[in-house]
Structures are given as C-alpha cells and as structure tokens.
C-alpha cells in the first residue's frame, strides 16, 4: 500500500495572495457579506490602482539603472551590468550595437553611493566587494539575474497589493545564497536597489512610501530564517506521515480558525456557533431553515458546554441523521462523518475497516463518539476550536486517496451517494500487471504510451499498478526466444515470423583494429534506406539526408551502429521525437526506434528520465546505443528492427474475421441521408422544388429604378414608389409639406440620388412619429429593415448589433447605417427603390420575412423574430386568500 496512487487530478494551488482574493475568500468562507472595513480596504486598493501602475512603469523603465547601481555597489574590477541577460525584445538589436546602462544618475551619484549608506542602512558585517574577473561569467550572469528577479517580484507585489508573493518566494533564500556567494553582499545590493528606486519618487511621498514598504519586506524576509515544514500528525501506522513546505501554506488563504473563549463578546460567540453549523451541516441551517437548538447554544455561550461537546451533540442530533446518515449507506455516511468531524477523508483501508465496524455495531452515535474522542481530534481541535477542512495548503495531502479526498472536500460532496474510499482502497488489492506504469488505459493504441496526459477530469479510481510493475511485451518471432526467459537468444534472428533483418557482413580492412562493412553500392543503399525507415519512421527528403555519413558508410569508414547513432542525433530526429513531446513520451518513442521495443516499466523510464534531465538528449542516445542490449541484439552491422510490441498493438494489426468493410456503419449526417435522391427528376420538377414555399408575388414584383431625370413620368413613379416603400402607403396628401417638397425638388434637380432621398424620408419627423415612437426598439429595427433592406432581421446577432446602435445614437443613426451598408449598395445601388426581397437563405429567416410583410403594420406590436418563445405572465397572489 506504499506505492499506490489515488488518481492525479489537475490542481492549481494558490501561489500567492492578493488583496481582492484574500478579502473575498475570507468573507466567502464565513458565509457572509463584506464588512465595512473590508470594503474600505478594497476601495483604498482600487483607488490607488493608477498610482501603483505608474510606480511599476517607472521601476520597469529604470530597472537596468537600478540593477546597475546595485551591481556597482557589490562588484569591482569590471562592468557588471554587461552580464545582465534581458528578455529578447520584439525587435532584435542590430549586430555591434549592444549598449549597457551603468547608472542613470551619473558618475557623481555612483561615487556618492560608495560612501553614503543612506542613513538608516547599515553595512552588514562580513561585506566584501566581489571581483568580476575572479567570480566568473556564469556566476555573474546568475547574480545579475537574481537582482533583476528581486525587482520584478517587487513590481508583482505592488500590483497585487499584498506582500505575500515576496514572503512566499524570498524567505529561505539566505541559506541558498550563502552556499553560492555571500548573504551580506546580497543584503547590500538590496539596500542599494531600495535607495536607487526611492530616488525616482522624491516628489511623491505616497509613491515613495509604497516602494519603501515593499523593499523593506524583501530585506526583512531575506534576513528571516528558512521556515520549517508543516508535519502532518498521524495517530496510526496505517496512515501516511507527510510534510508540507511552509511556502505553500503561506501562499494560500488559510481557513479561519474559530475558537470559543469566555472573553468574547456576544456577537463573536454567535459567529463561532455559526461556524460549527457550517462545518457539521455544510451550511448555516439556522439562517436557511430557522433550525436552532436554543438550549445547547445558550450553554455554549455561558461556558457550560465546550465546542467539542457541542459538535458531538449536533452530530448525534436527529437533523444530522436525516441529512447525512439515513439517505446513505454506511460506508458513505462514514466518509461524510470524517469530513465533518476531522476535516479530511479516510486515509487507509485499515482505518475504513475500523470505523466501519463501529458504525455497523452502534450506528451513528458510536461513530460520532469515536471520531470526537479520537487522539487526532484532540491534537488538531482540542476542546474549544471548531473543526475545519484540512484541504490542500492547510496540510500535506495523502497520495493514496488524493482524488477521492479532493472530491469529498468539495461543496457538492453531500449529493454524491456512491462511496468512493472503500472502492478505492479495495482496488489496490487487485493489480493488473498488463499495464503501463504511467497510465490507466492499458495502451489501447500503439501511439498512446500511457504517459502522463494532463486532464481536467477528476480521476478518483486507483491506478492499478505499482512502481515495480512490468508490461507484457510480445516478441516478433519465436516466443521461446523471449529475452526475459532466454537472454542468450537476443542475437538470434526472428526468422520468418518476425520482420525482415538488414545486415552487412564485415570484411577485413588494412587496419586490423577496425572492422569495415561491405563496399557494394546496392547493398549499402538498401541498408541506408532501412536505417532511415527504422529510426526516422519514413523516407527522408534529399535535403534531410546525412550525405557525409552515408559516404563514410559506403566507404567502410564507419559501421551501421555509428551511422544509426548519427541519424538518431540529427536535427530531423530531434524535431520529430524529442522537441514536440514531454520527456516520458519522447523516451518511449526513442526506445522503440533504437532498441526496437517499448519500455518495460517505471524503473526503466525513471533511469532514462534521469539521464535526459541531467545530461540531455545526446547522452540519452549514447546510453541506448552503447547499452549491452543493443550490442547483443544488433551488434555493429545490423539495422535495428522491431523486436517486441504490446498486446494492444498486436490486436490492432490482426484483422478480425467477423468484421468486414461492407458491414461497417456509415458515419453520415442524418440530413444527408434523408436528402439523398433516389429518382430522376426533370427540369420542371426541379424548378417547382426550388420555388416551393414562395408565392407568385415574387415573380410579380416590379422594381422601380430612376434611369433618366428628364423623364417626368418615370420620376413621379419613382417618388411614389419610395413613399409606398418607406411609409407603406400613398402619401399624396402629405407631400405638400415643406419638408418633403424640399427633398423632391432636390431629387428632380439631380442634387441627390434615390438612395439619399430614401435616407432623407427615413430621418423625417413623420417617419419617427409613425414607426419609432409607438414601438419598442426591437420592433423599430424590424420595421426599418423591412423598409430599407426589404427583409426581416436574420438572427439575434444582427438585432443586438442594431439595438446597441439605436439605443446609443438614435433612429437617425440606424437609418444611416442601413442605407450606407454594403448589402444596400449591392442589392439596390444608388437609383433603385428598395423593394421586398424573398431571401431563402438562411431558411429560418424566410418565414420571419413572410410574417413581417403579411401582417399590417398597425395591427400588432409583436416581434417577428423573437429570441425565445413568449410566455404568458402569471398572476402571483402575495397574500393568501385567508389573509
């Protein structure tokens, strides 16, 4: 049970705290609204936002000068700032134009800083400047990088409004730096950076105070000793003893600790009692359901009953039994009781068995007594502390119940009826040896190596393997020659049952200490092709071939083994099997290509992973090529071939007799299947189907277009058509108005086009009175699109677009936008009167246009293209009939 894992869900623990997150989480954990002091704190932080950004911009723009002053203070004998490696900017600097900033304040300021310690800054004992030439390039680069990181962390903390990010990342660095150089030197550099940064804010007292505050935190935390780890207490040998680094606990927002004391006020005692209800019932049942135990609460407030006994009484209450005992089976009720009374889930199979026997024997009261009277409860909560959830960040979490515990501590745990821990621990007793140690899928595909795929889903089941599990591999060839049962058979050829083997026989050379291969051009070209196919996985392009090494192989200067090694170290192989993948998957690929088999298990992957991490890609290739297994299996002049494969890979290569191509289900969309034509149709039949649903009115539509202004009759027809289109009726009696007379005369005098005449009518007072004032905005948009584009709105996106325009700029802007649109220009142009169109695409818009045109304008105010089906309003009686 020591090597098992309860699933590995993807978690992102909190790395630092901010003002907003800390304040809101504290209120959320206590199930309350923000108090006036917290709101004031947030308001102060948000009000200072612009000033904080200005501070950060100033520090960022002068970061090199600040780091330069600090470096000049602690380094001598060179230009230390030249070793600062800055992130590559968007525009690469030209060659030969690199410049370095020594100090923005000039030589005098730098000379003054040597003798002026700033009044309050005291040079620590043991400080001695470091010689640049003796310190070395690598150390100089790391030192300048660290100084730059200190300044960068300060800018992060200023934005967050909380120095927690500095506490989390800086405390404990002194011991690490002490091993590399000197903590006194680092302290002097930080003091100089503080002095240099404050010099940019001498005219702004508030900004200077903010910068000084965060620099003081950096110096204080740097001098503080490294925090000790949080050790998880355990009361049984079956539980895992774990420890959590202090920095993780400092980064998260801690659960509030509620402790009852006799000196608390009445309001504070009420808050503690509310916390007990929230922990035991997972919500404040007093506020939600007005359920209170006045007798117990009064005894707690008067000091007659401790919090521990109050928790025990609530756990034995009828309400708790109804909520968390009666609806569940015993194993699930046990898991929920662990959450409520100990703040965690069961940690081992032995613990589940122990408490399961208690709940089976004495029911819920005996289980509650056992948990509350346990030594663990006494050590964590005592008599007066309210139990709390011991989540990630509060203490170290066990790996054996990782996924199940995270799900148990979730807010929705009480809605899960199925027990999780008992099935999880039972699964550990049934290991499946035929499984890859880094996954649960048992390699269903050859390309899925079961490595660590990051998934957002929560896996609470056990991974059915241990660290010593070995995968089953099937030999391609005689099974009796498997290298595990018969290691001496590695050199045997697989024969007709395995893959084809390419091999060159060695011949004598002038140098007796070396071996050369055959000089035949045909055979060597076949060997070269086989090497590319095995190592690269395909034939290579001409530009990707290793011509120099191919010539050496043909001339007998190198062996096939050396040629394989060079191909495996090529940029092509690296780009295919190393760069795109994480290390575990790359190791699996490379192992298959070079040794001809998948990896056996976790121990082999761990060994290769360690080599790749410490020595790099080329050392990994050398390790595999120089291994005894490669030497025994292929030797010097044999091309590597596939020797073993997984059961899943073998199953994929075998054609099953009861499966045929003709019986495979067709993966076609339903509308394609229903739309298939099984008959021959004539032209008339096709035309009828094209025009189905469209009345004869489309064919009878007359389009009015102004071709010549001199044709008075045609001009009069166009003007009347515009009035009928825009106002939906003849306007002879309204045309005598001065407003319309001006528009008509300008059209007749060729001063405006038909398009501009239409826009002028749409922006008139009469149009606003008839089609804007009486209707809601959505109906106004539909009518405007009917009058000026000849159709209804296509969808809700179009309605939202014009609704925003109408609400912000008015009806005139809406009309101008429609008439000036690309659609209007393409359909009507400058001199065509808008007319009713019959748009059949999208099909869902056609009935909306029909409904819009077939209903009289003054008949209804309903919307033709609603976003949802309208519901009838219901009448709600606020008072009961008897009231």
Curated annotation (Swiss-Prot):
InterPro entries: Globin-like_sf, PBS_linker_dom, PBS_linker_sf, Phycobilisome_asu/bsu, Phycobilisome_asu/bsu_sf. Keywords: Antenna complex, Bile pigment, Chromophore, Cyanelle, Electron transport, Lyase, Membrane, Photosynthesis, Phycobilisome, Plastid, Repeat, Thylakoid, Transport. SUPFAM superfamilies: Globin-like. It comes from the Eukaryota. It is an enzyme of class 4 (lyase). PROSITE patterns: PBS_LINKER. (2R,3E)-phycocyanobilin binds at residue 181. GO terms for molecular function: lyase activity. It is a peripheral membrane protein. Its EC number is 4.-.-.-. Its main location: plastid. One of its GO terms (biological process) is photosynthesis. It is found in: Plastid, Cyanelle thylakoid membrane. GO terms for cellular component: cyanelle thylakoid membrane; phycobilisome. Transmembrane segments: none annotated. Residues 238-418, 488-669, 684-861 form the PBS-linker domain. The keyword tRNA-binding does not apply. Pfam families: PBS_linker_poly (PF00427), Phycobilisome (PF00502). Contains one covalently linked bilin chromophore. This protein autochromophorylates (Potential). This protein is postulated to act both as terminal energy acceptor and as a linker polypeptide that stabilizes the phycobilisome architecture. May have intrinsic bilin lyase activity. PANTHER family: PHYCOBILIPROTEIN APCE, PHYCOBILISOME 32.1 KDA LINKER POLYPEPTIDE, PHYCOCYANIN-ASSOCIATED, ROD 2-RELATED. Belongs to the phycobilisome linker protein family. This is Phycobiliprotein ApcE. It comes from Cyanophora paradoxa. The gene is apcE.
